[in-house]
């Protein structure tokens, strides 16, 4: 198999794992396959962000910007099946609803959403809507670019947690899909550098440095937070990290726009 074909299959594997976009080829959905595909998690976010940006751009000609923002948010949920939002809700329920590590993991496996999960999801969506609506006051491109950056960078930095932290869900009863559980240096470098290049192309050197440093700090705090609760990460906690880091991107972009 050629290198190009092998890398294309890894990208498609990452795409089908994180989205509901169908692909016309048979792929290796094992944990090892996802380990190798992890380098493309950020670029999958780029595609999701581009589609959301296109939805916003087209609909803002017809509807108020706030409505276009909601439609773009709906588009991302439809594309991903609410994959990361589900992780945020499960993590909030688990971390908020128990004190013991095993009980937290047990709650996170439950498909039902509790009060902590409902609150976390509602507040995250409200904040996302408000931040994107505020960006829309500056320009259409600020929202479109923000969506691309938010989905790219949040997935890249959340996935980078796999590199130096421990996967803690080994039980056969987990409701989660197979998950990437390890990442080599070359994979994490490609993951972060590809996201950084996209950020550089869209924002420039100064803004890129501010965004990346902020995300690195936020990523470190989130990794410590989940390690303190359960001793490592699960698919749910990575989903929660993605949602939180996406909000961090929008917050930083809004601050940068307000200072320009």
Swiss-Prot record:
Coiled coil: none annotated. Its cofactor is Mg(2+). It catalyses: alpha-ribazole + adenosylcob(III)inamide-GDP = adenosylcob(III)alamin + GMP + H(+); alpha-ribazole 5'-phosphate + adenosylcob(III)inamide-GDP = adenosylcob(III)alamin 5'-phosphate + GMP + H(+). Its main location: membrane. The keyword Membrane applies. One of its GO terms (biological process) is cobalamin biosynthetic process. Keywords: Cell inner membrane, Cell membrane, Cobalamin biosynthesis, Magnesium, Membrane, Transferase, Transmembrane, Transmembrane helix. Pfam families: CobS. It comes from the Bacteria. The chain crosses the membrane at residues 43-63, 64-84, 117-137, 143-163, 197-217, 237-257. GO terms for molecular function: adenosylcobinamide-GDP ribazoletransferase activity; cobalamin 5'-phosphate synthase activity. It is a multi-pass membrane protein. It is found in: Cell inner membrane. One of its GO terms (cellular component) is plasma membrane. InterPro entries: CobS (IPR003805). The keyword Magnesium applies. Its EC number is 2.7.8.26. Pathway: Cofactor biosynthesis; adenosylcobalamin biosynthesis; adenosylcobalamin from cob(II)yrinate a,c-diamide: step 7/7. Belongs to the CobS family. HAMAP family: CobS (MF_00719). NCBIfam families: cobS, PRK00235.1-3. Joins adenosylcobinamide-GDP and alpha-ribazole to generate adenosylcobalamin (Ado-cobalamin). Also synthesizes adenosylcobalamin 5'-phosphate from adenosylcobinamide-GDP and alpha-ribazole 5'-phosphate. This is Adenosylcobinamide-GDP ribazoletransferase. It comes from Shewanella amazonensis (strain ATCC BAA-1098 / SB2B).
